[in-house]
Each structure stands twice: as C-alpha cells, then as structure tokens.
C-alpha cells in the first residue's frame, strides 16, 4: 500500500470512529453509494490542496492545474448536464447536487436551479424555466446566469435582484407544476433577514432549502406544507443543528456547502471533516435518522 493510500485509510477510519463515538451510526450514507466513509478523507485531502486564490483562477480560466478536486468539479458538471438531458421524470422530481449549495431540479414539466454556481453554469441558462437564489453572496449566485435567465423573461426569485421574482415578503409563487413559498431567515448574527428560505412543493412532495442560516434563526424556520421530504441544509454559520432539525422534522436531510473552495481551510463556511462529523451527530440528536451528504455531481433523488 502506498504512503498516500495508507494515510487516506487512516483518515477514513478516524472519521468513522469519531462519528460512531459521537452517536452517529452510519445511516448518513444509506442513500448515497458514492458518499461512503471511504470517500471522506480522499475528498478532504484533495480539497485542502486548493486555496481560494487557486479556485478563483480556475473560475476565470477553467484551468484545473492538475488538482484532482477541480477535475472532479468539471466532471461533476458534465455528469449533471448529461443526466438532466437523459432523465425523464414521471413522479417525484429528480434532484442533483452541482456544487456547494447549488442544485438543479427536474420535474415532469419544469427545470429549475437553486443557488447554482459553477464555472460553466451559463450552459444551463437556456434550459432553466426559473432560478431561486437564497442570498447575495458570490458562492450562492452568479450575476451572468441570473441576467441571462431574466433576459429570457423567466423568473429569478430572490430578495435582492430587481427582476421578475424579487420579494422580501412571505409569498407563494406558482410556476408550471412547482409551488414556491418564500420566507426570510438570518444568515448570521449581523446579517438579519438576509437569506430567503425556499419551501418547494411538487404534487405531494416537498423540498426545503435554507441557504446559509445562522445562530438564533431557528424560530424563523417554518414549513407551512408540513414535514419536508427533503431538506437541503447547511449546518454552518452558527445555526443550532439539534434545535433546527427537531423543529423541522424533515424526513430526510442532505448537507450542502461541502468543502466550498472559495473559503479558506478551517473556515466555518467550508463544511469539512471536523465540522461535518459534529453536524452529522447533531442531526441524529435532533431526531433525523436519515441524514447524508451529497458530493458534487451526485443525484440526490
């Protein structure tokens, strides 16, 4: 066994041992064949090699510079694009993780995005029926993509972009076969009512996406349509994960903001292995036994 491979194996064992010791028994990977304990240390080690400066250069010129995680980010986009085109939806929507808190969702009649950010995201501009943006931070939206969608007279629902779809109120939109309910939550202690939480319903199936949510915002979390089937959740920015999970009672939680490359290492906006282990354990304490991860390019539903 090579030295690097041995190091990865040790890292993975430490992750699993720590999760079990924290009361997390491994159900996090039940629905994610590609997100097994064997993958955690590999992704962690690969992303640690890429600084925010290198990531910024990649976003400008597309050069992966031999970094494995940037090559994976390119392949993830290609995988999502291919599967979106090839997938026919008859019932429950199909949901893909692209990067960070960015997702693409396909229903029987619609294709839309939430917080889509990728170097090549403009390739989706002509395909999307609408876009949802939780807040005004560069790791959650791209100006060119939003302009392109709005320029096609399609809604961009946000609390800050002055185009069709702008709102800072509690409001329900109906677009094709999708209902979207908006409400404001806090990003952190000083960005109050900065993030739009989206409650999304397609038929009898519902999704909750809370963007970046901070300490003390738990009372503002609300799901008028009952327990969401899926909650796309970032357990960072100071939110009390145990309280939030106990309140929302989602049937399934998938963590996002994994290894966001625009944040420096060990930043709480970069959900990496130490934060991840605590968050998984806290979700279990909050009562959700179906909590998992989605890496870039993974199909979630």
Model-based region annotation:
Residues 117, 186-249:
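Active-site-proximal loop/helix segments of hydrolase catalytic cores
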Residues 135-137:
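Detector for the c-type heme attachment site
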Residues 124-125, 150, 174, 191-192, ...:
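Extracellular/periplasmic catalytic domains that process cell-envelope and extracellular macromolecules
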Residues 2, 7-10, 16-98, 103-130, ...:
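Metallo-beta-lactamase
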Residues 166-181, 192-193, 222, 246-301:
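Binuclear metal-ion centers of metallo-dependent hydrolases, dominated by the metallo-beta-lactamase
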Residues 90-93, 183-188:
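Short, P/G- and charge-enriched loop/turn segments at secondary-structure junctions
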Residues 132, 157, 181, 232, ...:
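Hydrophobic/aromatic beta-strand patches that form the interior of the parallel beta-sheet core
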Residues 91, 101, 169, 194-196:
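Residue-level marker for the onset of beta-strands and adjacent loop->beta junctions
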